[in-house]
Amino acid sequence: CACFLESAVHETHACNYLLADDIDMEPVPGYAAASWKRGYGDFVFKPDLSTMRLVPWLEGTALVLCDVQDHHHQDLPHSPRGILKRQIARLTERGYKGMFASELEFYLFDQSYESIRAQHYREPRTANYHIEDYGILQTIRDEPVLRAIRKHLQAAGIAVENSKGEWGPGQEEINVRYADALTMADSHSIIKHACKEIALLQGKAITFMAKWNYNLAGSSSHIHNSLWSLKGNKPLFFDAKAEFGMSKLMRQWVAGQLKYAGDITYFLAPYINSYKRFQAGTFAPTRAVWSNDNRTAGFRLCGEGGKGIRIECRIGGADLNPYLAFA
């Protein structure tokens, strides 16, 4: 619109409590960056115009993602997108380009958000009645919502590869083509909002909680990651002469993730509910080990012996922040 082009295309401002609140948008005390003592002033939203796109599921609507800056136009040190950008810069200095893909699982409910809230979130009705994993008949029941999600995301410039039923009643997964770390994190964020908004428009509801029901499969966000040349044309994890096709660099990369698995889990499982997902016999990992094509390990080798070789971190739940998780 004209107002955006006149001013907001350069920047706009918002209350700085937005990076110091809880999941219910309540301000949380104890932060140096934003508090009642400091008066909850503004920070700057600087649009990243490379992320601008139409929002096909909403008439006359466009979307642009922003970097969060202070009044001197310096990135805030605690901005998740800024944290990832700094990590990417460090990786670039070493001559590497990180490529990522995140699988997103969620539960679809055959109720609206309002009706679920009215029943105090107790026993919401899932869109299906038994395990959907790779099932054809079951996922047809969910297709009106899933088709809309795939179609609209594709129209919004996100390269959807597929959706599929998962290991719970009404549980689905959406997969998109891998990309550089920042593009993938941006896409991940847009996908989650799109899924919830499209479901709302159809009178349905979606949750990305890691474990909304103790007796059902949790929802994960598996992160596929690999290193490439800066031009993105040479996979640096592949060595045709090495065991499994794993280059020395890849082995070092995996070793680092294993060594710090406990520390990075803070960003992969950020909430109390996140840890309820870690149950044996549910396809959620319970050991910080790596293995070749083994879905019970925290880190799974995929694409053995080929240029698509990568490591899949299976620790993360669907509730993770993609910017912090990728960083």
Predicted segments, located by residue:
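ATP/Mg2+-dependent ligation/transfer catalytic cores
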Residues: 1-162, 325
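Core alpha/beta catalytic barrel or barrel-like domain that forms the active/cofactor pocket
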Residues: 99-107, 119-136, 156-176, 206-226, ...
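Short beta-strand elements
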Residues: 117-126, 221-231, 288-290, 297-303
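A generic structural motif
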Residues: 69-75, 138, 178-184, 231-232, ...
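Accessory "access/gating" subregions that flank catalytic or transport cores
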Residues: 137-142, 146-160, 174-181, 192-208
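C-terminal accessory/tail domains of diverse enzymes
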Residues: 183, 194-206, 237-327
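Acidic, His- and aromatic-enriched active-site or binding-groove loops in soluble protein domains
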Residues: 121-146, 181-192, 196, 230-240
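Short, hydrophobic beta-strand segments
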Residues: 64-70, 172-179, 225, 313
